[in-house]
UniProtKB/Swiss-Prot annotation:
PROSITE patterns, sorted: TRP_SYNTHASE_BETA
Gene it is expressed from: trpB
Function: The beta subunit is responsible for the synthesis of L-tryptophan from indole and L-serine.
Protein name stated in the entry: Tryptophan synthase beta chain
Modified residues (N6-(pyridoxal phosphate)lysine): 92
Subunit structure: Tetramer of two alpha and two beta chains.
Presence of the UniProt keyword Acyltransferase in the record: no
NCBIfam families given in the database record: trpB
Pfam family name, one: PALP
Domain of life: Bacteria
Record key words, sorted: Amino-acid biosynthesis, Aromatic amino acid biosynthesis, Lyase, Pyridoxal phosphate, Tryptophan biosynthesis
Pathway: Amino-acid biosynthesis; L-tryptophan biosynthesis; L-tryptophan from chorismate: step 5/5
Length: 400
């Protein structure tokens, strides 16, 4: 994997990715691709990016040895990359800072975004306030009900939250609506996509902004334990936190990479969001080609996960490619496993993780006991769980 290079000039990662959009969007995406290419080669752009990551987001985020949890499980040592400590409480802001700087460079006055759990919506509203832009966030009506605290946060930050009533009223539908809006107002509007998916150049761009996670982790693990972890694990919905951790490790062949999809009620039921693990065929959604949960007529299937942020029927194209070339292993954690991991991290480490991140913790909980005490698992703790306490309380039958 030393010579891993993706995507190609057409935005493909192997057979995944690309640009599958209506004619009306082609000029906007071309303008974006050109602007990003120029920014990518401009040291001043990265200087501004690093400045905001340090002084505004509070990076670098630390790596932390979850010693009590490791001892309780008996086996591998579990370390956490603490993305939950970023401003706004998740990894999402790494990407929104980058895209907002690009929007500013392109002279756009308005940003729009889609959101599932509300984390990307909050991160987009945050950077819009930071850079003086107006912001509209598209959110499925069902997700609005699940994530009221984040909806209020976005409004506090000055954003307009647009409820999407069509389809399954979740992330997929919010993304459809945001893309429609972008077509209508492409002149003054920049669309901040929140995950490593969508039409080219988004998957590459989001990955590049999120790679700060893996780049920091490599240096930090070297300093902390004198070597790299045996396994690096992250949850995968669209997959931006995971690609940010994995990409810098692709060339490190002795580091096993594990992506954890949302197993929901089980991949043998219709209620999950695990396109790779469930063996979903390739399809096109939201402007890119990738593994996609669909029926025999190519209709996109409904999904289910206890975490709104993993509740997506597709997966970022680079993840599909990394699965194809067997560099990353993809597996699932079910709702109940994620909830158990959530409880364990709260009780043993005093850290309330996001339900999304709890899926990655669940893999460590399950696998650490099978490994040696001298082995190390690095978990990307992609976000904090304040936004999920209502969901968890409801599942436990507790009224807040």
């Amino acid at each position: 994997m030393k010579n891993y290079h993706a995507p190609d000039e057409k935005g493909f990662f192997g057979e995944h990715g690309g640009l599958f959009v209506s004619e009306t969007l082609i000029p906007a995406l071309q303008e974006l691709a050109d602007a990003y290419k120029a920014a990518k080669n401009d040291p001043e752009f990265w200087e501004a990016f690093r400045h905001d990551l340090k002084h505004y987001v509070g990076r670098p985020s630390p790596v932390y040895h979850a010693a009590r949890l490791s001892e309780h499980l008996g086996g591998a040592q579990i370390w956490l990359k603490r993305e939950d400590l970023n401003h706004t409480g998740a990894h999402k802001v790494n990407n929104t800072i980058g895209q907002a700087l690009l929007a500013k460079r392109m002279g756009k006055k308005r940003v729009i975004a889609e959101t599932g759990a509300g984390q990307h919506g909050v991160a987009s509203a945050t950077v819009a306030a930071r850079f003086g832009m107006t912001c509209d966030v598209y959110m499925g009506a069902d997700d609005i009900q699940r994530q009221m605290p984040n909806v209020f946060r976005m409004k506090l930050l000055g954003a307009n939250v647009v409820g999407v009533e069509s389809g399954s009223r979740t992330l997929k539908d919010a993304m459809n609506e945001a893309m429609r809006e972008w077509v209508a107002r492409v002149d003054d509007t920049f669309y901040i996509i929140g995950t490593a998916a969508g039409p080219a150049p988004y998957p590459e761009m989001v990955r590049d902004f999120q790679c700060v996670i893996g780049n920091e982790a490599k240096a930090q693990m070297q300093e902390a334990i004198g070597r790299q972890p045996d396994v690096a694990v992250a949850c995968v919905g669209g997959g931006s936190n995971a690609i940010g951790l994995f990409h810098p490790y692709i060339g490190e062949e002795n580091v096993r990479l594990v992506g954890v999809e949302a197993g929901g009620l089980g991949v043998n039921t219709p209620d999950h969001a695990a396109p790779i693990t469930s063996g979903a065929p390739i399809g096109v959604l939201h402007g890119f080609r990738s593994y996609l949960m669909q029926d025999e007529n190519g209709q996109v299937l409904g999904t289910h996960s206890v975490s709104a942020g993993l509740d997506y029927p597709g997966i970022g194209p680079e993840h599909s490619h990394l699965h194809d070339i067997k560099r990353v292993e993809y597996t699932v954690a079910k709702d109940d496993e994620a909830l158990e991991a959530f409880d364990l991290l709260c009780r043993f480490e005093g850290i309330i993780p996001a339900l999304e991140s709890s899926h990655a913790v669940a893999w460590a909980v399950k696998n650490a006991p099978k490994m040696g005490k001298d082995q190390v698992i690095l978990v990307n703790l992609s976000g904090r769980g304040d936004k999920d306490i209502n969901t968890v309380a409801k599942l436990k039958g507790i009224k807040l």
